[in-house]
């Protein structure tokens, strides 16, 4: 019975590592699509999101099965509980990638391109590094760099505020391009949300470690 329990935990761990790789690739490809306004790549990401959600739900099901059927010890229970919550944030992160791709379609549909907000690439890269770092910490079982990840979330928040101000000014100066700038408002908001979800994952990593920061 114990062997089956350990095997189930190992299988879930392998699934989570594979999911992390898929998430990292999706985030990287989403930026490529956004930077180049590549409708084809955006469509692949948008329509492929359901496959990622299916993987997430499969991991959730395995996690719940272990929690309910295998009688985990206290340490493992905290790990399983944290994994369930982390999976929700992972699903939302990839949903936001699909959301961004949806607005790439809008940017292309509304006519000629407009200049994206200053610092958009840097904002996206900081967010992407947060996701990569938290998934690495989850899979490696550590809590190093938690404070650094949270500091990055503050950087994304500041970039979000600055971008909103810049887009508002451009809407006034270029009223013919308001629809495109609205798309950028939503894109920037999704990036900010992705960083928030990454920050949420740090809380559950700390919960799992039973070493919450004061």
Kindly give the residue locations of the regions a language model identified:
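Cytosolic, long alpha-helical scaffolding segments
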Residues: 1-214
């Amino acid at each position: 019975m114990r062997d089956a329990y350990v095997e189930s935990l190992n299988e879930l761990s392998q699934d989570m590592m594979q999911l992390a790789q898929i998430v990292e690739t999706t985030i990287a490809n989403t930026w490529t699509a956004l930077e180049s306004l590549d409708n084809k790549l955006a469509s692949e990401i948008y329509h492929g999101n359901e496959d990622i959600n299916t993987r997430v739900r499969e991991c959730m099901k395995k996690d719940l099965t272990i929690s309910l059927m295998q009688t985990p010890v206290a340490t493992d229970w905290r790990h399983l509980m944290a994994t369930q919550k982390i999976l929700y944030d992972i699903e939302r992160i990839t949903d936001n990638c699909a959301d961004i791709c949806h607005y790439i379609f809008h940017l292309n549909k509304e006519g000629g391109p407009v200049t994206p907000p200053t610092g958009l690439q840097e904002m996206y890269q900081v967010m992407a590094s947060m996701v990569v770092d938290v998934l690495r910490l989850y899979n490696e079982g550590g809590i190093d760099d938690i404070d650094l990840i949270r500091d990055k979330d503050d950087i994304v928040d500041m970039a979000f505020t600055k971008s909103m101000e810049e887009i508002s000014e451009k809407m006034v100066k270029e009223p013919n391009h308001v629809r495109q700038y609205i798309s950028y408002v939503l894109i920037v908001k999704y990036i900010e949300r992705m960083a928030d979800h990454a920050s949420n994952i740090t809380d559950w990593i700390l919960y799992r470690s039973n070493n919450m920061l004061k």
